[in-house]
């Protein structure tokens, strides 16, 4: 639904991805990989066998001479709908923070073996899409997450990792996507679904 599994932005046409459902800014990126080991990413070398559901490297928005470092990095982790149990190894917050730590370690190289400057100043964004179960609530509380005003998710900023993280329920994901589209449909005077 969002992006094909075990694919990259190099081999998936724009019309076969629905990244806008999570955040419309994700449609504009430099490189995206889905369910591919960090060590196997094309043009980038990160010594790790971890496989984020989605890892997205964004273009810088400022114009610079030569090849620019990444403006931001986005990690998306999906958990199966209606999943009940999680043990500590399956804690999605630990998972995304682990991916981010590996990327920030400074061992990331381009396809020619040159180090890619991923400084501590580059912002990271993490989206965890899952049902909000009692265990997810426990993980969120432990990490100091704040409940969203609609009670359908959590958010947090981790200063040590320079990472903004959202835990989004599947219901909230669908609800927010509908709301974003309804505004456009209303402006175009098209039928609106509620």
Where are these regions (language model features)?
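Charged, terminal alpha-helix-loop-beta segments
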Residues: 1-194
């Amino acid at each position: 639904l969002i992006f094909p599994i075990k694919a990259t932005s190099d081999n998936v046409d724009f019309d076969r991805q629905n990244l806008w459902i999570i955040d419309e800014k994700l449609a504009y990126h430099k490189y995206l990989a889905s369910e591919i080991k960090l060590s196997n990413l094309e043009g980038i070398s990160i010594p790790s066998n971890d496989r984020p559901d989605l890892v997205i490297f964004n273009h810088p928005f400022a114009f610079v001479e030569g090849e620019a470092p990444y403006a931001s990095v986005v990690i998306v982790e999906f958990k199966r709908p209606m999943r009940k149990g999680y043990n500590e190894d399956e804690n999605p917050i630990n998972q995304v923070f682990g991916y981010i730590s590996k990327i920030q370690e400074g061992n990331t190289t381009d396809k020619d073996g040159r180090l890619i400057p991923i400084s501590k100043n580059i912002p990271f964004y993490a989206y965890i899409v899952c049902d909000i179960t009692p265990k997810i609530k426990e993980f969120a509380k432990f990490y100091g997450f704040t409940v969203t005003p609609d009670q359908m998710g959590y958010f947090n900023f981790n200063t040590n990792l320079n990472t903004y993280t959202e835990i989004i329920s599947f219901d909230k994901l669908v609800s927010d996507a509908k709301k974003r589209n309804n505004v456009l449909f209303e402006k175009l005077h098209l039928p609106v679904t509620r």
